[in-house]
């Protein structure tokens, strides 16, 4: 688990405190779609290229336990993905990003990346969290039957893994 200092350092490496936040977008493809937690002034349907959405991160916290790990979605290399682009409110963007960093980066299972969000309103530059294949939480491809069993049976403090599937 990352410390507050590590999280802040990581966020500042991607988005320094003095960043102009007037056109700052975040790409949501999993729980951010239905529970964005960040104050935003606009949301648009967006497609990214070069990554696809996949259950590829083990969780022993939110949607699983040490005894029965669950799986959560991440972006993995290849393909494309439709999700939601959130334009952050400029006056609160840095504080909102710190909150988002605590939620998404605490286990260091993701890498933060700038991606092109293709929307009906043009191309936006957006921040996305993609799977870090070097972390132990990364789940390489598995038989479909095993994936279904995991999602159907795992439960964590945020509820059953299958609820996460249906919510996203």
Language model feature labels by segment:
Residues 1-168:
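A glycine-rich, hydrophobic/aromatic-adjacent loop/helix-cap motif
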């Amino acid at each position: 688990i990352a410390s507050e200092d590590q999280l802040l350092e990581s966020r500042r490496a991607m988005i320094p405190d003095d960043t102009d936040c007037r056109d700052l977008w975040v790409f949501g493809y999993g729980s951010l779609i239905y529970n964005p937690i960040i104050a935003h002034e606009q949301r648009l349907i967006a497609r990214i290229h070069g990554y696809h959405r996949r259950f590829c991160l083990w969780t022993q916290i939110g949607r699983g336990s040490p005894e029965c790990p669950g799986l959560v979605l991440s972006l993995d290399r290849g393909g494309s993905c439709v999700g939601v682009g959130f334009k952050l409110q400029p006056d609160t963007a840095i504080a909102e990003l710190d909150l988002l960093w605590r939620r998404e980066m605490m286990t260091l299972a993701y890498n933060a990346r700038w991606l092109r969000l293709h929307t009906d309103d043009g191309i936006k530059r957006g921040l996305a969290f993609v799977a870090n294949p070097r972390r132990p939480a990364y789940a390489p491809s598995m038989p479909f039957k095993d994936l279904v069993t995991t999602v159907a049976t795992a439960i964590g403090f945020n509820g059953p893994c299958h609820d996460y599937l249906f919510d996203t």
